[in-house]
UniProtKB/Swiss-Prot annotation:
Keyword annotations from UniProtKB, A to Z: Calcium, Cell wall, Glycosidase, Hydrolase, Metal-binding, Peptidoglycan-anchor, Secreted, Signal, Virulence
Organism encoding this protein: Streptococcus pneumoniae (strain ATCC BAA-255 / R6)
Motif range (LPXTG sorting signal): 1735-1739
Bias (Basic and acidic residues) ranges: 63-75, 84-111, 127-137, 304-324
Superkingdom in the source lineage: Bacteria
Name of the protein this chain belongs to: Endo-alpha-N-acetylgalactosaminidase
Amino acid sequence: MNKGLFEKRCKYSIRKFSLGVASVMIGATFFGTSPVLADSVQSGSTANLPADLATALATAKENDGHDFEAPKVGEDQGSPEVTDGPKTEEELLALEKEKPAEEKPKEDKPAAAKPETPKTVTPEWQTVEKKEQQGTVTIREEKGVRYNQLSSTAQNDNAGKPALFEKKGLTVDANGNATVDLTFKDDSEKGKSRFGVFLKFKDTKNNVFVGYDKDGWFWEYKSPTTSTWYRGSRVAAPETGSTNRLSITLKSDGQLNASNNDVNLFDTVTLPAAVNDHLKNEKKILLKAGSYDDERTVVSVKTDNQEGVKTEDTPAEKETGPEVDDSKVTYDTIQSKVLKAVIDQAFPRVKEYSLNGHTLPGQVQQFNQVFINNHRITPEVTYKKINETTAEYLMKLRDDAHLINAEMTVRLQVVDNQLHFDVTKIVNHNQVTPGQKIDDERKLLSSISFLGNALVSVSSDQTGAKFDGATMSNNTHVSGDDHIDVTNPMKDLAKGYMYGFVSTDKLAAGVWSNSQNSYGGGSNDWTRLTAYKETVGNANYVGIHSSEWQWEKAYKGIVFPEYTKELPSAKVVITEDANADKKVDWQDGAIAYRSIMNNPQGWKKVKDITAYRIAMNFGSQAQNPFLMTLDGIKKINLHTDGLGQGVLLKGYGSEGHDSGHLNYADIGKRIGGVEDFKTLIEKAKKYGAHLGIHVNASETYPESKYFNEKILRKNPDGSYSYGWNWLDQGINIDAAYDLAHGRLARWEDLKKKLGDGLDFIYVDVWGNGQSGDNGAWATHVLAKEINKQGWRFAIEWGHGGEYDSTFHHWAADLTYGGYTNKGINSAITRFIRNHQKDAWVGDYRSYGGAANYPLLGGYSMKDFEGWQGRSDYNGYVTNLFAHDVMTKYFQHFTVSKWENGTPVTMTDNGSTYKWTPEMRVELVDADNNKVVVTRKSNDVNSPQYRERTVTLNGRVIQDGSAYLTPWNWDANGKKLSTDKEKMYYFNTQAGATTWTLPSDWAKSKVYLYKLTDQGKTEEQELTVKDGKITLDLLANQPYVLYRSKQTNPEMSWSEGMHIYDQGFNSGTLKHWTISGDASKAEIVKSQGANDMLRIQGNKEKVSLTQKLTGLKPNTKYAVYVGVDNRSNAKASITVNTGEKEVTTYTNKSLALNYVKAYAHNTRRNNATVDDTSYFQNMYAFFTTGSDVSNVTLTLSREAGDEATYFDEIRTFENNSSMYGDKHDTGKGTFKQDFENVAQGIFPFVVGGVEGVEDNRTHLSEKHDPYTQRGWNGKKVDDVIEGNWSLKTNGLVSRRNLVYQTIPQNFRFEAGKTYRVTFEYEAGSDNTYAFVVGKGEFQSGRRGTQASNLEMHELPNTWTDSKKAKKATFLVTGAETGDTWVGIYSTGNASNTRGDSGGNANFRGYNDFMMDNLQIEEITLTGKMLTENALKNYLPTVAMTNYTKESMDALKEAVFNLSQADDDISVEEARAEIAKIEALKNALVQKKTALVADDFASLTAPAQAQEGLANAFDGNLSSLWHTSWGGGDVGKPATMVLKEATEITGLRYVPRGSGSNGNLRDVKLVVTDESGKEHTFTATDWPDNNKPKDIDFGKTIKAKKIVLTGTKTYGDGGDKYQSAAELIFTRPQVAETPLDLSGYEAALAKAQKLTDKDNQEEVASVQASMKYATDNHLLTERMVEYFADYLNQLKDSATKPDAPTVEKPEFKLSSVASDQGKTPDYKQEIARPETPEQILPATGESQFDTALFLASVSLALSALFVVKTKKD
């Protein structure tokens, strides 16, 4: 791709059209005035056009009004007030039902809208009530647009008192989503504007902000615990006077996105959970205008109300232009039987069309130029007429200056009523080889354009002359359609369109082009056509041109593959009245257009896919394995009586959704692998289920084998462009690089794996530009790659893939995106393609506009297999029949007529606007059956506005809330036989309805069935009377009507799953052999309507047994069943292979299920009973023998009153060896290396750290070097050993359980002791802890730490180790039998070492990895306890930040423990350890520096949340920073101490990144206790993040300190002051090294002794001395004791006398009893009451944190224990 295309500046602009504030602009400048960013589309430049067109484009005024016959927003805001923000759909429906019933109009025609009374124009934006935050608001009009001008004033600032403005109704919605769309102009003086939007605003210290200052756009969030802002490269701030279209979305899950003029302002930001939780109840959305000194912000925001604004761009006088001069033109004609075209022999130009005596112009003025690579060329043309219908033009294209040397053949051909314009051959005489490097990209024919050569036109001289065109709009308030009368005079027109039509009162014409052009993003994408007004003589002509085509393109010199090229083609179709309504308009052209348009691959299936949904797998949990999804297909087939289905498999690959992206052929093994997936594909066909998969072509994760440095996208500053961060931190890719380097091969690999049968590929994310060019051309190439494999193309966004896609998720999932980002809002587009796509605005009333009851419906997508936590089966079915059946019914027809009503005023989402509703739509099918859909009222305030009547061939099939609609197609769209034809009945309200049946149904009897998950039930024979039937049935319950009696198809449940009916969907237990009281075993439904087996109230054991089929001999298997046991009675799963029996059981379930995509999670809508779910899988691992004919599985429950629930049985091959190195469930040492995990994170289950969520813990796969330490600054290994480890991403500071074992996975038996060891990686100290608990976990309340746990915090593993560390703990099973172990997220914050954003996420500071878990039963001894304790305590005694007195006591006690006898009892060991724990808790830290608590006051100018105390918190990532508004250099920071304290100097620690506020010159004044001032200065400190020191050269007993930065670094210099830390050092008395001279002398003397016993004693003392020295245990008293002891050794038979010195409690080999006591230091040392979490260097107490950090780290160190010999 030519590099110049990336950097090209706009050379022209065109008029823009939009409707209302927050609009998706319906047309815009083709390119902006700035260089095209990498995010921008890279096609569509039309520099160097013919002079008149270029001039028009260059001089067309920017006008944000949708001027051409678009209704203006009325001043009457007659809709109900919106005060609390948009309501949920459920609330709106409830309100609607509460309204009194309105009497239906007696006339057949719809009720008219009520007339509106104009009102005075008032400001739509108001300043806030708080006086200090008030600005000014004025109304102004400019160039035909009304604005509210918002200004800050002198009383405002840019921190706590900015000018704030609010708009009635603009709030965060009921679901927690915020959407803001503004069109504004910055009227401030250049570089002085500080404007933006506050979201979820509580006050200026608690909010989310998106805005700009002179340095550009940025985001920021603030909360009491976490505040930060964007520090990356910024998008430039708007130019003064420029028009800006700002779009911001903040989703409830914390994802923040923003764009201005369709340019992304930053990559997706995900708010920290703490911030999101803190602000979740805040609803305010405000605009901010800041002031600083004399700089004011002035911004004009376009208003909704544009009524009465005068436009100034329509010429007052008739226009004239050059006359046509054909004196040198030679014309010819080509014609079919119906259409004649007059063509120019010198150039492929059509002068005029004739059809049945009526004419339409083409390009009336002579034109003879082609634009190659945006260079104007006049070709040498050879004309050849092939036959009556066809002519050819051979063009020689030469431009030596631009290396263009090519030939091109263009063919004009008339076919029936069509004109085809085709480039049939292109020869580039430069050497170009697809896939190879080219030396100069100018040699490519990158783009080809015939702009200026209108394919068809209409003249103002013709009666009824009009142009009608469609652009992309996804804003429900704003139609993308333009309807323009072609008159003289008229406004200029030069604009891109997706669809375009010209018409007179006689003829209409439409144009299709395969141009994949983008004139920009938003409404300017997919602009395949260009409409242009040209004045010729005394007439105005509006012509439709094909936009530019793309041909040969490259990426950094690598030519794109051959398949990316597509020969340019365009077609014109001309028609008379096509819909027999006795008039000609665009609708006739649109009907004819279907005969020339492209048809997206797979479009014929769309109408029959009625039951779309997502089956979700995530985070290694395999919630919906492939073959279980097959059972879901069968269940829906029964419940819908055979409607077609579409199942999108999110998480088909790797470890589930958003794992392993780009490796498309990596089929998820834990959900069944390739074999099960192929089985699903094959078996689903029978039920008309179309399967698709979710992929990502925009970002990748380190685990993927396609993750490599070359494909990754970088920001301008060289940093990586980060994407989604959930299981792993993703990085965006460069899509152009990917295309040039073999992306196609990945699709081909997938096809090879799966073969045929997969229906569609859903491309996630693509379209938001995060991988670069995602515009029309790039998207079409991607779709071609997918189509080439035989797959249908689907996409995420409503605007994405308009040319090729048949399914758009954000259009279909109505809760997504907000009102500005929904389906396509264009009546023209929907008219043309309603039957081909699920891309439309659906019925979601709170969005308003087109979403308030569209007549043709629109897909409404729900789910019951885990996506978004949706597992409400009944809700899914109800929604399907309430919304989707009729939507799909209409798609079996094509639209033939569309009638709009009178504009109505709507108010929602903070906007008041006009909307023109469609009132009547006609549709026909191939058999000429006619459907008419009519809205009952044009009055938006009437309930009948939201009701329709539908007739089929004049017979009513829907009336308001009820329909009885014929359905004559099977699940695959084939016509049903007459006896199988049916009608679906559904009514959202109860009550009787009467229906006229078609004549061929009007027999005496018909048969009605209630539809349930068991199929057709409760048969009713109904009598037909006078051709009518009356139905009085349940509300929201589907029924089906047949002519004759019907039966249900036989279902073979759970094919390939080795058991019949794994999910109890059959409704019967007859396939089980039941022992015990069978009546106590029954199938019941959960709160989410999920079928379960329940055993309850049994007086004896109840067992259900079934054979496992299809097993392989001598093969290892795993089987699990979900179980929720509310009883203390044992519930078991047992497998008997005929040779061996394995059993696993659980007593009362103790762990709630927090797995969001699991149908049995503990959300109320999915709960088992009582609004909770304790469902967890219970496993049995077994190995088959040689005979597999009689392998049985048994589910059983012992006697008990309470209930036990079972569901989802799954059996599959598994090669784990966890039990004593054997596979089968059994005794022995348990080992889990995570290399062969069956499913989930066995033996752990997910804890409540995130609530019910898509868990951020998963099995991480190794991809060296990218998942390992070192790459991109990564601090820890994601995979510790082998290919897999268990990874938790980013769950720090949660004070909750990450994961835990449960007894059914590993049982810590009562009274038995186990050694638990594992290797781990942790990115920060003490953020995660190993915990031991029993019973149900009880989390701490209100953010406090859980109290019922034995907790061992774990230190980081990378600052002092080159590999993972090992932890060892002893666990004794409680008598209750419900002990468990797990990993806990503490309340401690991570330390990101100055990194932030994606870097902090990627590098692992917030992560925890586990591997090589081992649980070994041991016979507990005192020695084990002492050895384990020593591992925990030795790191603590090595620390140097505690006082000598407190540490010596601990050292001596630890040494005593190290010398304990091997046979020390358990009780004695525990007693000794308790003493040590008390001494450890009593440690006192040294005071090395002043801390915040030492000061009586800290006073300094500061930005909110960035006060001076931050410089004393020990956290390098928090800052003291003066006001961001600047101006605080030279202002003092004053620190007053509580009492005079000795200090010796200052260490200034600058911020870790950036320069703003870094001190350059400083003045430091220290006032001592006598009042004397000591002044120090420093100058020219360098601008870096290294510490800077001022050494006082003396000790000062300070009472007050004043620090002033007189010169600083940063933006502009001398604006701010900042510091990460201010460390005022305290004098330290150096600890005197231990005096060993006495010991050495005694040792020298003792070494001369000759008695063997003495020699052994000396050796023992030496060993003990070495052990104490090596392990930092030596104290003065110990040295003194050792010396005294040695001095008393003599060569004699007598024992030495007792030493004269009082000694600690040592146990040396020659000492049999205690001869001294360890002093009770705990009585002497008072522990501070509040152990703050502060850096040790500051001297602040932090006992638990620091000591656990040290003690646990020893578990990863080698221990050298001296074994002393007894006397």
